[in-house]
């Protein structure tokens, strides 16, 4: 297996995306353990510019850590894990291109793969943690309890508490769950949302504009943070599609999260849509059929309000175009 040769390197950095979720963190924890087994004298660490509250709870439970840093020092070998586009990382891109980059992901393949020496992308897997768990199984290496907890949390989180699970998912859960209470996994993933997230949800709903097209309820809104969670919440309370924009002046960045119901994804793949819109805005995007996101630079010559309006109108326009095109075929 070619992957093992890269894991055996003397120094490896495992990179998570912004606000690293349990799938990203669980996958990195497992890869770091595997690398340490293959090269006991190696130097291995995990880095992200931020991690989610749920991920922090899991890391505390299993006694692992993620170094929180922007523009980390890059060793010769860098693993990028559970990340759809380069804009989800706070790294020196020119420096990264000169490194030995390995990508393991379950999102739609994007330009990020072009700079990689080696990559494993399995879009049909509901989580990256399942890809990693399968690697352990193929190698006949049974991971320790803390690593299995991390992988199980990643799987359950990214499958929306098994709503997106398939038969392979349950096979891998059965493989990992020995001596672990499933109730414990659910508990680690059900910590109450912090006040800032709940406040963002309320603001997103209060600012929401609903447009109707072909009997679809398309919700457009904006917040300062937690845009992905807000988009998910808006769909859960009745929208067919939701686009939520967050403009971060300090980081000079625009973020958009999109979510939709399953019947909509039969016509429009949100990951593909976000990739196209991301490029149109001078950034990048990607994701899955029912969930996508993009990052793009923020032009400070325009007001925040104007940018929000322009981006939401663009998302609506491009979605309608793609939907019409799909229905005609």
From Swiss-Prot:
It comes from the Archaea. GO terms for molecular function: nucleic acid binding. Pfam families: DHH (PF01368), DHHA1 (PF02272). Residues 284-303 are annotated as: Disordered. This is Uncharacterized protein MJ0988. It comes from Methanocaldococcus jannaschii (strain ATCC 43067 / DSM 2661 / JAL-1 / JCM 10045 / NBRC 100440) (Methanococcus jannaschii).
